[in-house]
Amino acid sequence: APLHPPREMVLERHIRHVNNFGGGPPVIEARWNNALQELAEGSRLGIPIVFGTDPRNANPRSGFAQWPPQLGQAATRDAGLVRELARLANEQQRAVGVRFHIAPMADVATEPRWPRIPGTFGEDAPLCAELIRAYIEGLQGAGGIGPESVICSVKHFPGDGPVVDGFDPHNAYGTYQAYPGGQFEYHLIPFRAALEAGAGAVMTDYAIPLGIDAVAAAFSEKLIAGLLRGEMGFQGVVVTDW
């Protein structure tokens, strides 16, 4: 249950980003989101809420149409198919009022013990890059961000794929990422493609990149201000993971 009533969260605490991961009938979610949006837009400044979600089309409890996660899509090596599935996801998410998509995962899965590999496009960075572009074009639109776009938050910069011993950095024991053979740039290939495709947001990760910085990417001025904003020229939204 929420810590505070929805009316208080919207009108008094001015919450304007809400993540809703589904689990019930989409028609109920649409009514709920519309009710919250009506509260927000009826406030003094009328600033609307941005509703976000993780991918739902590989989660049978979501009430959405079902197809394989990113790894299954990568097995087809068909960028056109990935683009079309993303376009369908756009339609389904907009139907319930969701405009922020917490994906795709641009992590290159070079550590086979990492448990989140099914959510990635695999270990081949050039293939990942090709499919990332298609995914973003399907969700956001090939012509850039517009009225019918669902914004993609590509993750987890600069890449969770090489986590040490496969320990995920969402947990206290998943502290480090390693780049044997100097492969840091290899893991950036899909992220560069995502930015070229116009990704509206980038999500950082919580692992410390060995040999790159002494703090996690989410706290790294070197990686966010220096690399992502500076060298790579990203001007969109940067968010942390949760």
Question: Each predicted region: which residue ranges?
Answer:
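Glycoside hydrolase catalytic-domain context in secreted enzymes
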Residues: 1-242
